[in-house]
Amino acid sequence: MEKLKSIKITLVKSLIGAKKRHRLIIQGMGLRKINRTVFLPDLPSTRGMINKTAYLLKVEE
């Protein structure tokens, strides 16, 4: 079975002032505080969440 690539995602901007929908997406990714990092699998659903909220995140592959 092939191992999925992972993406390193860091929250770099505050959620204050962000759209409610974007706040919910960020929380769904497991990010709560600024400068916290999560590793998520490189899937189309994850890429979609990143595209919607890219102005709040730093993404490394």
Curated annotation (Swiss-Prot):
Subunit structure and binding partners: Part of the 50S ribosomal subunit.
Lineage per the UniProt record: Bacteria, Pseudomonadati, Pseudomonadota, Betaproteobacteria, Nitrosomonadales
Protein family membership: Belongs to the universal ribosomal protein uL30 family.
GO molecular function: structural constituent of ribosome
Name under which the protein is recorded: Large ribosomal subunit protein uL30
Gene name tied to this protein: rpmD
Organism this protein belongs to: Nitrosomonas eutropha (strain DSM 101675 / C91 / Nm57)
Keywords: Ribonucleoprotein, Ribosomal protein
Pfam families noted in UniProt: Ribosomal_L30
Matches recorded under HAMAP family: Ribosomal_uL30_B
Record keyword Repeat present: no
One GO-annotated biological process of the protein: translation
Key word Transmembrane present: no
GO CC list: cytosolic large ribosomal subunit
